[in-house]
Amino acid sequence: HTFAPTGTPECVKSSAQFGDDWYGPYMGFDHVEMMLLGHNWFLPEEPPRGQHYERWFFADGRGHEKNAAYQQNGRDTKGAAQTHHSMLPVAWHNSTWTADRAIAWMRDRPEDAKPFCGWVSFPDPHHPFDAPEPWSRLHAPEEVDLPEHRTRDFEGRPWWHEAVMTSEPAGEAEHANIRKNYSRIPPQSDAQLREIIANTYGQIALIDHQVGRLMNCL
C-alpha cells in the first residue's frame, strides 16, 4: 500500500492508468493477470480502478451485489475479530478466480510450447478470516486444538512489537483507522480463537481444492 500514486499496476491510485487490454509484460513475466488487494476487508475496487480481478468482478454489473453477499455472515462467530462466514458464492471468490485464470492460461498454450514457469499466488490465508460457505464450515470450532501459548506477551520481544500494538498511529485519519481496526486484533477468548482458526482452515481447504484443479489441468 502506498499513500501516493506510483505509476505501477499494483498501486490502487495508479491502476486506472492500465487499460483493459494490459496483460504485461511486468516484473519478468510475459503475461500478467492481477488483483489489487485480495484481502476483503478492502472490497474490490470499482473500475476504472482495479486490475483484472476487479474488472471481472464488476463486469456483469453485479459487483455491488457480490460485495453485499460477501459482507453477510452465515452464522454466529462468538464475536471473534474479523471473522465471518462469507455468503459470497465460491465462484466469485478470488481463490477460485486465481485458479480459473491459471487454468485458462495453461490451456491456451500450444501443444508444442516450451516448458513454462507460472507464478500462481493466492491472497489467502489472511485476515479477515472470511472463508465462504460451505468451506467455512468444514472444521468445527469446538474441535480445534489451541496452541499452548496464545495470550499476548511482549516480554523478551523487540520493542517495536509492543509499539505496533499499543501506540497511537500517526498520519492521516484514514491510514490511522486502518492501523487500529485492520492491522491490530484485540486479545481473543479461547472460543473466539477457535472460530478464527477453524475459519482459517476453511480458507486453506479452498486453496487446496484450487491447487487440485491446477494439478488436474497439468
Predicted regions and their residues:
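Catalytic-site neighborhoods of secreted/periplasmic enzymes
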Residues: H1-L88
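Short, solvent-exposed turn/loop segments enriched in Gly/Ser/Thr/Pro and often Arg
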Residues: H1-V12, S121-H126, T151-H161
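A structural signal for well-ordered alpha-helical scaffolds and beta->alpha junctions
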Residues: W22, Y26, S95, A99, ...
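Short glycine/proline-rich turn/loop motifs
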Residues: R75-P89, H175-A198
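A long, amphipathic alpha-helix that forms part
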Residues: W92-P110, L146, P186-L218
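Active-site His/acidic residue clusters
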Residues: A104-R152, K180-E195
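Mobile, glycine-enriched helix-loop/loop "lid" segments at the mouths of ligand-binding/catalytic clefts
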Residues: P141-E162, E168-H175
